[in-house]
Amino acid sequence: MTAPLIEGRGLTLSFGSERVLDQVSLSIHAGEIITLIGPNGAGKSTLVKTLLGLQKPDAGDVLRKSGLRIGYVPQKLAIDQVLPMTVKRFLTLTQRASRPECEKVLDQVGAAHVIDAQMSSLSGGESQRVMLARTLLLRPELLVLDEPTQGVDVTGQAGLYRLIDDIRHEHNCAVLMISHDLHLVMAKTDQVVCFNRHVCCSGIPETVRQHPEYRSLFGLQEADAIGIYTHEHDHEHDISGHVVGGCGHDHSHDHDHGHSHAHHKHDHHTHTRNDAASQQEAVTRK
């Protein structure tokens, strides 16, 4: 196996008398999708900051590929409603890019039609896609997504997960997703890491929910409520959730969410929402 893009070894960190990271080891390889799940206060954001070099650990080491390009997409972007800023302007705030370059990345994320729209007018799904487009201008090798489906409806969530998988394959970039959402984990995640100041357990989504530490952390009812199911679409939805091809029937009421159906593809894990707004940044680490 090739060397990881980024690797944390035995990371330990305390804030005063409180231990927030306890001997954490985690590695991320090119083309891999990892979802980090855990309750509020578990230290997920602190772990990510430590891996990215924004927080120094008390003990342990972080190894990064030389010149690693990292793109970060926050939970949401707080922009004043009265501040005039088009999507094109937002994409070029901290980097130079021509209009054709902006149109290309927006097209890749299914949002080419909003290039001249005001940022304040975008829906939750459109905002997430625009922020993804902004990171693609950097050609990231590692894409870090903090609660990527927050504020996005169920149809939009499925679309974002398909988009993330497409980006992973097209750009051969690794993806690290942070989630408080225990019911909804992307089915194509290569590894789910259950985290509460230390790595409780890890593996593919179907097996993590059976792990004793997972069930202990989130409770038996929450663990049993998780059902990852797979469906195949015979139609597509646009960014607003409207059917744009194939069958125009709304399948959302045709099936119980606890079993498989032949016409959809979704993944389910549980939610606790963190509503703190954060600013988008992209960092390049040497």
Predicted segments, located by residue:
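Conserved ABC ATPase signature
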Residues: 118-122, 126
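Conserved catalytic motifs of ABC-family nucleotide-binding domains
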Residues: 139
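H-loop/switch region of ABC-family ATPase nucleotide-binding domains
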Residues: 179-180
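H-loop (His-switch) and adjacent beta-strand-loop-beta switch element
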Residues: 192-204
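ABC ATPase nucleotide-binding domains
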Residues: 210, 217-286
